[in-house]
Amino acid sequence: MSVPPHLEEWEPKTKLGRMVKEGEIKTIDEVFAQGWKILEPEIVDWLLPDLEEEVLDVNMVQKMHKSGRRVRFRVTVVVGNKDGFVGVGQGKAREVGPAIRAAIDRAKLNIIKVRRGCGSWECGCGRPHSIPFEITGKCGSVRITLKPAPRGTGLVAGETAQKVLEMAGIEDVWTKTTGGKGKGETRTTINFAKATFDALRNLIYVRMREEEAERLGIVSGSAEGA
């Protein structure tokens, strides 16, 4: 595996980081299987070099202080490889650039393995283009329900949820959302992103019989070879 140039001088600060750089752990699947907590974004950079990122929201926050008005930027970002791994994070800083970088790092630390499949009774193709079953996620007043959709449906979702789902590698899904009204566009964007992420995270906790998982074509993480 070729190492991205910016990682050649990386000096890991955690045991997991050292194991990754020394080649003891070679895949992100091993990290999840062994229950490691990711504390360095470079670990994700090393194991998922094809990760992409997209800014979902940039918000300027002003606070009055005895020395005058202070301005900070709060940024929400989604990262993913469009094949079963996705993360959402927020960052704050006095300038937009550093806030974006902080949000990207936080999103990498929050990365999860997404369970995909074909749970629509209208389809039954057995490929991981959708989700295997209906699932709900919440954040604040926002609640989103993801429902399996047949192949070719696309992502029937709001713009924010759509971006998170795309980064996770989900191609077809129906959604139903409640809440978030009257809270302001920025707060709603953040909550919808986090609620969608919460729903995707909840997929992994549902227990299924092996034969049922096989029928639904369930894949956790990368679908390469599926």
UniProtKB/Swiss-Prot annotation:
Q: Which GO terms describe its biological process?
A: translation
Q: Which residues form the S5 DRBM domain?
A: 51-114
Oxidoreductase as a keyword?
no
Cellular component (GO) terms are: cytosolic small ribosomal subunit
- Tell me the domain of life: Archaea
List the keywords (alphabetical): Ribonucleoprotein, Ribosomal protein, RNA-binding, rRNA-binding
Its Gene Ontology molecular function terms? Answer: rRNA binding; structural constituent of ribosome
InterPro entries in the record, alphabetically? Ribosomal_Su5_D2-typ_SF, Ribosomal_uS5, Ribosomal_uS5_arc, Ribosomal_uS5_C, Ribosomal_uS5_euk/arc, Ribosomal_uS5_N, Ribosomal_uS5_N_CS, Ribsml_uS5_D2-typ_fold_subgr
Q: Which PANTHER family match?
A: 40S RIBOSOMAL PROTEIN S2 (PTHR13718:SF4), RIBOSOMAL S SUBUNIT (PTHR13718)
Question: Member of which family?
Answer: Belongs to the universal ribosomal protein uS5 family.
Q: What does this protein do?
A: With S4 and S12 plays an important role in translational accuracy.
What the entry says about domains is: The N-terminal domain interacts with the head of the 30S subunit; the C-terminal domain interacts with the body and contacts protein S4. The interaction surface between S4 and S5 is involved in control of translational fidelity.
What is known about its subunit structure? Part of the 30S ribosomal subunit. Contacts protein S4.
* Protein name (record): Small ribosomal subunit protein uS5
Native organism is: Methanopyrus kandleri (strain AV19 / DSM 6324 / JCM 9639 / NBRC 100938)
